[in-house]
Amino acid sequence: QAKEMGLYVLPMPFMIDGTEYLEDINLTQKEFYEHLSGDHDVSTSQPSPETILNLWEKLLEEYDAVVHIPMSSGLSSSCQTAKMLADDFDGKVQVADNHRISVTQRRSVQDALDMAAAGMDAEAICKKLEETGLDSTIYITVDTLKYLKKGGRITPAAAALGTLLRLKPVLTIQGEKLDAFAKARTMKQARSMMITAITRDLENQFDD
C-alpha cells in the first residue's frame, strides 16, 4: 500500500527468541501475532542508523527534501535517533515528532501527502504535523498483561493481580503517553468501553 501512495517505509525490526525479523519482509503480521500468542520471547527494536541514512541519501538523490514521520518519541527511541541523524543534513531532512502511532500515524502520513500536493515545503509540513499531533487518541485493549509487564508499563504485582482477576485493561494512547483508561472483566465489555469513549471524543471534537 505504501508503494501505491508513493511512500518509503522503514521496516520495524522484531526479535523473536533471539532472531531478528523485519516487518512485512521476512515476517508477516499473521506470523507475528502467532508468535506473540505462543510461548515466545518477543521484543521490538528500531531501524539501524545505517538503514535510515541509506534511505535518506537515496531519496535525496531524487528529491529536494525528506519528511520523516517516526513513531511517537514517548513510545519509541526511533524518533530521537532520527532527529540526531537529521542534524547532519542541513535541513534537507525534517523529522516530525507528532506523537502518533499506528492508525493515527498513518493519518499523519496522509496529511503530509496532502500538504505536499498543496505545495507546502518539508519544513512547513513538519511544523504542521507537530502542531496537530495531539488531535487524536487511540484506545486499545489486550488479552494478556504479559507484555505490558515485560515492557515496564505495569508492575509484576499488578500484572499478577490482573491476571488472577482476569482483567482486560483498556488503554489510551495520546501524545507521549500510554495510560490506563479503564478495567473490564471481559473482552466484550472492553470493546463496549472503547466504542463509548470514541463516540464521546467524536461528539466533543465535532460539537460545532
List each language-model region with its residue ranges.
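A general structural signal for short secondary-structure boundary/capping elements
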Residues: 34-39, 56, 113-115
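Mixed-charge interfacial surface used for oligomerization/domain docking
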Residues: 1-19, 65, 74-94, 100-208
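N-terminal glycine-rich phosphate/adenylate-binding segment common to multiple enzyme folds
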Residues: 51-79
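Generic short alpha-helical segment signal, independent of protein family or function
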Residues: 37, 57-64, 87-90
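Short catalytic-loop micro-motif centered on adjacent basic/acidic residues
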Residues: 44, 68, 95
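A general structural signal for well-ordered alpha-helical segments in protein cores
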Residues: 29-32, 49-52, 82, 109, ...
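A short glycine/small-residue-enriched secondary-structure motif
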Residues: 27-32, 61, 83-88
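N-terminal glycine-rich anion-binding loop in soluble enzyme alpha/beta folds
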Residues: 1-51
